[in-house]
Amino acid sequence: MSRARSGKVNKNRHKKILKLAKGYRGRAKNCFRIAIQKVEKALQYSYRDRRNRKRQFRALWIQRINAAVRQYDMTYSQFINGLKQANITVDRKVMANLAVHNADSFVHLVELTKKSLAKTA
């Protein structure tokens, strides 16, 4: 019985890792043993940062909404509370986009929240 060799399988596996390591500095781009470690760490970073990106964008939207709302003598928390009391369901991404690109409709939202806050106060 002939010996089973893994030449093609190993070559393809090495090629896949070295392709992922393209653009790395030093031996990490062409030495398989180092490249596999660097690629694995890079994939861990990308996995982690895909989750962090969601947090960072939510924080950015909140900052933009807060800055826009403060022009109308409100705080972010008052604005969100007013939206909930007025039964307006607009997500933060859309509100931030309105605040930056469509100020007229954002002002309308602010007025609605002020009215709903005035009713309860």
Curated annotation (Swiss-Prot):
UniProt keyword rRNA-binding, yes or no: yes
GO molecular function: rRNA binding; structural constituent of ribosome
Top-level lineage group: Bacteria
Keyword tRNA processing belongs to the record: no
HAMAP family in alphabetical order: Ribosomal_bL20
Annotated keywords: Ribonucleoprotein, Ribosomal protein, RNA-binding, rRNA-binding
Database matches in Gene3D superfamilies: 6.10.160.10, Ribosomal protein L20
GO cellular-component term (any): ribonucleoprotein complex
SUPFAM superfamilies: Ribosomal protein L20
Family membership noted in the UniProt record: Belongs to the bacterial ribosomal protein bL20 family.
Protein name as catalogued: Large ribosomal subunit protein bL20
UniProt-listed InterPro entries: Ribosomal_bL20, RIBOSOMAL_L20_CS, Ribosomal_protein_bL20_C
Role summary: Binds directly to 23S ribosomal RNA and is necessary for the in vitro assembly process of the 50S ribosomal subunit. It is not involved in the protein synthesizing functions of that subunit.
Organism: Orientia tsutsugamushi (strain Boryong) (Rickettsia tsutsugamushi)
Biological process terms in GO annotation: ribosomal large subunit assembly; translation
